[in-house]
A protein has these predicted regions:
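N-terminal Rossmann NAD(P)H-binding glycine-rich loop of SDR-like oxidoreductase domains
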Residues: 3-23
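NAD(P)H-binding glycine-rich loop region in Rossmannoid oxidoreductase-like domains
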Residues: 35, 39-95
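Conserved Rossmann-fold NAD(P)-dependent oxidoreductase catalytic core, especially the SDR/UDP-sugar
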Residues: 85-87, 97-139
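Catalytic helix-loop patch of NAD(P)-dependent Rossmann-fold dehydrogenases
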Residues: 90, 126-164
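NAD(P)-dependent short-chain dehydrogenase/reductase
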Residues: 146, 155-164, 168-199
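Alpha-helical substrate-binding/gating segment
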Residues: 182-190, 198-232
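Mid/C-terminal beta-alpha module of Rossmann-like enzyme folds, strongest
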Residues: 218-265, 298, 304-315
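Hydrophobic ligand-binding cavity/cleft-lining segments
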Residues: 305-374, 378
Length: 479
């Protein structure tokens, strides 16, 4: 199947793409910035400009079996101004209308149109249990979401199956609400809004991408579909579960009046109560991987397969320039990560050997950008790229120190933030036709004792998160 996706470089899209690729789908992504998307979405995807040539857009739609429309500017955590509301509408309603119009002009239009929506369509219903037949609300968010859905439903007139995906709060450590909440909770101070009695309908990111594929393959599913886990919780309960996995010491309520001063009308995203159940998914037989919140959070914050320690061995393939760093006395650290995937080693090696796939399995908050990379890659190849954490940009140059096709390769930093960085990638065949991917990184920070303090307080923690995300995307791509 060929899938056409909008919003591909967003939080959900960056998980959906590797998952659909693992099922054999080919993908075209319509994006606002092709250069940026190329650094985020990997080498195995076709990119077009969503606001470029209408002929190119229509040609892409003509060859597509399915459209997944995920486009939409971020609503939560921003102040709603007149300008922002215009952006919300244009990126949702107007873009959907434009897609629908182009599809109606196709000679061989897609058979299925899945369009993102939100449980915000129901309005503030407090403790009322909601399913897909519940009435919609009357506030701005409900009306916006209703217009968004109605734009998609125009395709029903053309015998195209339409599903609108009423998403709850999507959970993944490196995106969405958990990315925003985690720093404070991990520093020991959690919070919830108001008295915490508002219901939160949530869903784990893995279940989102699985449910999208399920809707694609199940012809009986049509119309609105609640993308929420079966067990919604209150905001206070959510904070309590998050405290348990992050070891936060204190949870304090934040008066909603304070947030209203910050976000204006946008506070309703945080204070409205939605106790929405996935009735249509459950009745059709969909099985959730994460049906309770504790299970979902424990999975997201688990780092058991990534370990960092002081290096107690000499560096592999030590060069003259770096041999003086060998051994534990030199404050060299070793990161070790292992993942087993259902894929052959040759294909796996090719995937990781392409520099253009790096951005796909790098967290979005690193703002990864390739500056220079020439293929084919081999021993001695040089790559230049840039990462940006907050306001701090860091240029990085590596060269391939060792290259053994389909087995291993090692890259070494020649310019960048580390005094030493050597990353060995091992791709190993297993007897059961799976593949083990091993990452072994030796690294050292500059600035002596200050570097060691920075490592203990921050760097070790960030590296574990980065490689943990890498493994999660790997498991989606090669499930």
């Amino acid at each position: 199947m060929h899938v056409f996706i909008t919003g591909a470089s967003g939080f959900i899209g960056r998980h959906l793409i590797p998952y659909l690729q693992s099922t054999g789908c080919t993908i075209t992504a319509a994006v606002r910035d092709i250069d940026k998307a190329k650094n985020q979405l990997g080498a195995e995807i076709e990119l077009i400009d969503i606001y470029g040539s209408k002929r190119t857009l229509r040609d892409s739609l003509n060859k597509s079996d399915i459209v997944v429309n995920l486009s939409g500017r971020q609503l939560a955590g921003v102040r709603w101004t007149t300008k922002k509301k215009k952006e919300f509408s244009e990126s949702r309603v107007l873009l959907t209308r434009m897609l629908v119009h182009e599809i109606t002009l196709c000679e061989t239009p897609p058979k299925i149109f899945l369009s993102a929506s939100a449980v915000g369509i129901y309005g503030d219903k407090r403790s009322e249990t909601l399913d897909e037949t519940s009435t919609i609300g009357g506030d701005y968010l409900s009306n916006l979401t209703g217009d968004w859905e109605n734009a998609a439903y125009e395709l029903n007139k053309h015998n195209i199956r339409v599903c609108t995906l009423r998403l709850g709060i999507v959970l993944a450590r490196e995106g969405g609400i958990l990315l925003q909440l985690s720093p404070a909770f991990e520093l020991g101070f959690g919070s919830y809004i108001g008295n915490g009695d508002q219901f939160i309908s949530w869903i784990h990111i893995d279940d989102v991408v699985r449910a999208i594929e399920y809707c694609i393959r199940n012809d009986a599913i049509t119309g609105p579909v609640n993308f929420t886990a079966p067990l919604p919780v209150t905001a206070k309960e959510f904070a309590s579960h998050l405290r348990n996995v992050t070891k936060a010491r204190v949870i304090l309520p934040i008066p909603s009046i304070i947030l209203r001063l910050i976000f204006s009308e946008g506070v309703i995203v945080l204070t409205n109560s939605h106790k929405a159940l996935p009735t249509k998914l459950m009745d059709s037989g969909f099985k959730f991987s994460y049906d309770n919140l504790n299970k979902a959070l424990v999975h997201e914050y688990s780092t058991q397969s990534v370990a960092v320690s002081k290096s107690d061995t000499s560096l592999p393939n030590a060069s003259a320039e770096t041999s003086n760093f060998d051994g534990p006395a030199s404050n060299v650290y070793e990161l070790y990560a292992t993942t087993i995937i259902a894929n052959d080693s040759d294909d796996t090696f090719s995937f990781f050997a392409s520099p253009w796939n790096l951005g796909l399995y790098t967290p979005g908050w690193l703002n990864f950008q390739i500056l220079e990379a020439k293929e084919p890659i081999g021993q001695g190849s040089v790559m230049k790229y840039q990462i940006k954490i907050g306001p701090v940009s860091m240029a990085w140059m590596t060269h391939i120190l060792e290259w053994k096709p389909n087995t291993t390769f090692t890259d070494e930093q020649t310019r960048g933030p580390y005094k030493l960085w050597r990353h060995q990638h091992l791709i190993l065949n297993n007897p059961d036709e799976t593949t083990t991917v091993l990452d072994r990184v030796h690294y050292k920070l500059p600035l002596g004792i200050f570097g060691r303090i920075a490592h203990k307080l921050l760097v070790k923690y960030l590296l574990i998160r980065i490689f943990n995300y890498r493994q999660k995307i790997m498991r989606l791509r090669f499930k």
